[in-house]
C-alpha cells in the first residue's frame, strides 16, 4: 500500500501541519487517506466518540482526511507530568505512569501492536501519511526507535525531510540530519521540504542547488510562512497577532499547560487579541482572564503563587474581572485541592485561590468522556459540547452554583451538574475542554466583554465550520508550493500529475 512519511530536522518544523495538508490534498484527488503517528508526546489531547484519548495533531489530520478521529491514528500518547516522567496512554487508555528510562526500555513491547494496527490501515486506505516525531537524527534513541526511521523501516515507507527556515540554519540542519543517518536510513529519504519561508524564492535557489548536491536528495518544494486559524498542537505559541484589537484576553501560561488548543476558537474573533501571562509584571488589566488546563495542577498553582501571579488574579477578581478556568484552571480557583494517592504530585493537599467555592479531590481513575449540555448558571438556552479529561472531581460549597447541565455523555442520556460560577457571575470554571468551539457560549461571553467596553455586539462563528475552510486554504498553499508530481512518484501512485 502506498505510504509516505514526513520527518523533520527538529521539533516544531511543521511536520503536523504538512501531514494535514497532504491528507487534504490526497482526499481532494480522490484517494482514501489516513494519518498515522505511532507515538505522540503532547499535553494537547482529544476524546474520541468511544471515549478514548489521542493527540490533537492527528485529530486535525483526521478532519483533513474527511475521517472521524480514532485512536489507531495515534496508538501511543505520552503526556509529560514532570521533566522526567509521563503518563503512557496506549490505544486511548492509561497504561502506566513512567520515567523516561522506564519508557525507553518498554518501547519494544509495543512493536507487535504497531505492526498490527498499521496492517489494518493498509487494508482500509489507499494512502497513509505518517508523521515522525522530533528528529530522526537523535542517534541516542536509534536502538529502540518506533516513531522515526525505526517506524519507516518497520512499515517500509519512503521519507520526506522537512526543515524550518524561519529559525535560521535550515541548510545546516538538513545536512547535519542526513549526515547522522545510516546509509540504509539515507536511502529512504526521497526529498526535502523547506518550510516557513519569507521572501523571494529565487534568492533561495542557489542554496537549494548546493544542498541537493551535498546530500544527494532533491528538493520538492518551499512552503511560505503563513497564518491560518488552525490549531498549533506542538507548542504554546505566542498569540500576539492583533495587538491593536480592543478586547484583551490574557491566558496564564502554566509550566505544565495542557490543551491550550481550547483557546484557538477565540483567535477567530475579529476584535480580540490573545496573549500569554508569564509573570506578574505582564498581567495588565485584561477584559478576560483564562486559566487553562494543567497536567500538574498543584505544582502549577504553587508556581503561580510563588511568582506573584496568584495575587494578581485575586485582585483582578475583586475588581469584577472576568475569569474563566478550564479543568486544572477550574480546580485552582477553588478552596482546596487534595491528592491523597499521589496521582499528580507528592504534595497531598494545597489551599486553592478561594475564588470559587468548590473543592477538588484527585482519584486514580481517569475520566475521558464526550459531553453535551446546556449552560444553566450564566444564562439560558445556550448549548455546549466538548470533552472531559481529568483525574479528580469537585464538590460544591454554599456559594457556588453549577455552570452547566450535562445531558449526554458518550452518546448516552444523563442529567448532572458540572462546572461552577460565583455569585457575582464574573468567575466561572468547567472541566469541559473545547467548550469555546461552539459559537453560542463564546458569543455570549464575547458580547458581555463588548458591552463592558461599549463595543457593538458581533455574531460568532462555529469553529469547526471555519476550520474546514482553513484546511482547504492550507491544502492550496502546500499544493502550489510542492512538486506534486514528484510526491506522487515517491508514493508510486498514479494520479493526474503522472499523466
From Swiss-Prot:
One of its GO terms (molecular function) is ABC-type vitamin B12 transporter activity. The active site is at 327 (nucleophile), 433. This is Cobyric acid synthase. Pathway: Cofactor biosynthesis; adenosylcobalamin biosynthesis. It holds the Pfam family CbiA. It comes from Clostridium kluyveri (strain ATCC 8527 / DSM 555 / NBRC 12016 / NCIMB 10680 / K1). Catalyzes amidations at positions B, D, E, and G on adenosylcobyrinic A,C-diamide. NH(2) groups are provided by glutamine, and one molecule of ATP is hydrogenolyzed for each amidation. Belongs to the CobB/CobQ family. CobQ subfamily. Keywords: Cobalamin biosynthesis, Glutamine amidotransferase. GO terms for biological process: cobalamin biosynthetic process. The gene is cobQ. InterPro entries: Class_I_gatase-like, CobQ/CobB/MinD/ParA_Nub-bd_dom, CobQ_GATase1, CobQ_N, CobQ_synth, GATase_3, P-loop_NTPase. Residues 246-441 form the GATase cobBQ-type domain.
Amino acid at each position: 500500500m502506498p505510504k509516505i512519511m514526513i520527518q523533520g530536522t527538529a521539533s516544531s518544523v511543521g511536520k503536523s501541519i504538512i501531514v494535514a495538508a497532504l491528507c487534504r490534498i490526497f482526499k481532494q484527488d480522490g484517494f482514501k487517506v489516513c494519518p498515522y503517528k505511532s507515538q505522540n508526546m503532547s499535553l494537547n489531547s482529544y476524546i474520541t466518540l468511544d471515549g478514548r484519548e489521542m493527540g490533537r495533531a492527528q485529530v486535525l489530520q483526521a478532519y483533513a482526511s474527511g475521517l472521524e478521529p480514532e485512536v489507531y491514528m495515534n496508538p501511543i500518547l505520552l503526556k509529560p507530568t514532570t521533566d522526567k516522567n509521563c503518563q503512557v496512554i496506549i490505544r486511548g487508555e492509561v497504561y502506566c505512569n513512567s520515567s523516561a528510562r522506564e519508557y525507553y526500555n518498554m518501547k519494544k513491547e509495543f512493536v507487535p501492536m504497531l505492526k498490527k494496527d498499521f496492517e489494518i490501515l493498509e487494508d482500509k486506505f489507499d494512502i497513509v501519511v505518517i508523521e515522525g516525531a522530533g528528529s530522526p537524527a537523535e542517534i541516542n534513541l536509534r536502538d529502540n526507535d518506533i516513531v522515526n526511521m525505526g517506524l519507516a523501516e518497520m512499515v517500509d515507507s519512503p521519507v520526506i525531510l522537512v526543515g524550518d527556515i524561519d529559525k535560521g540554519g535550515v541548510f545546516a540542519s538538513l545536512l547535519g540530519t542526513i549526515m547522522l543517518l545510516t546509509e540504509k536510513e539515507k536511502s529512504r529519504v526521497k526529498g526535502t521540504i523547506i518550510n516557513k519561508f519569507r521572501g523571494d524564492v529565487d534568492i533561495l535557489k542557489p542554496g537549494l542547488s548546493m544542498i541537493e548536491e551535498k546530500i544527494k536528495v532533491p528538493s520538492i518544494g518551499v512552503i511560505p510562512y503563513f497564518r491560518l486559524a488552525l490549531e498549533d498542537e506542538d507548542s504554546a505559541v505566542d498569540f500576539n497577532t492583533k495587538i491593536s484589537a480592543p478586547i484583551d484576553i490574557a491566558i496564564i501560561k502554566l509550566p505544565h499547560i495542557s490543551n491550550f488548543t481550547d483557546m484557538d476558537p477565540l483567535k477567530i474573533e475579529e476584535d480580540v487579541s490573545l496573549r500569554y501571562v508569564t509573570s506578574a509584571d505582564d498581567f495588565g488589566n485584561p477584559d478576560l482572564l483564562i486559566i487553562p488546563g494543567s497536567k500538574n495542577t498543584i505544582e502549577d498553582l504553587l508556581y503561580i503563587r510563588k511568582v506573584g501571579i496568584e495575587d494578581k488574579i485575586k485582585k483582578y477578581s475583586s475588581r469584577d474581572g472576568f475569569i474563566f478556568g478550564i479543568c486544572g484552571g477550574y480546580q485552582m480557583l477553588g478552596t482546596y485541592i487534595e491528592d491523597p494517592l499521589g496521582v499528580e504530585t507528592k504534595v497531598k493537599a494545597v489551599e486553592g485561590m478561594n475564588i470559587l467555592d468548590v473543592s477538588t479531590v484527585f482519584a486514580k481513575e481517569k475520566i475521558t468522556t464526550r459531553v453535551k449540555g446546556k449552560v444553566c448558571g450564566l444564562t439560558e438556552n445556550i448549548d455546549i459540547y466538548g470533552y472531559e479529561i481529568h483525574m479528580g472531581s469537585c464538590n460544591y460549597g454554599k456559594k457556588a452554583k453549577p455552570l452547566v447541565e450535562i445531558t449526554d455523555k458518550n452518546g448516552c442520556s444523563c442529567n448532572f451538574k458540572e462546572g461552577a460560577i460565583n455569585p457575582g457571575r464574573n468567575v466561572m470554571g468547567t472541566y469541559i475542554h473545547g467548550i469555546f468551539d461552539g459559537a453560542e457560549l463564546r458569543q455570549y461571553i464575547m458580547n458581555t466583554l463588548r458591552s463592558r467596553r461599549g463595543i457593538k455586539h458581533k455574531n460568532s462563528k462555529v469553529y469547526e465550520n471555519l476550520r474546514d475552510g482553513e484546511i482547504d486554504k492550507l491544502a492550496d498553499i502546500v499544493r502550489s508550493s510542492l512538486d506534486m508530481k514528484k510526491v506522487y512518484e515517491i508514493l508510486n501512485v498514479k494520479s493526474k500529475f503522472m499523466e
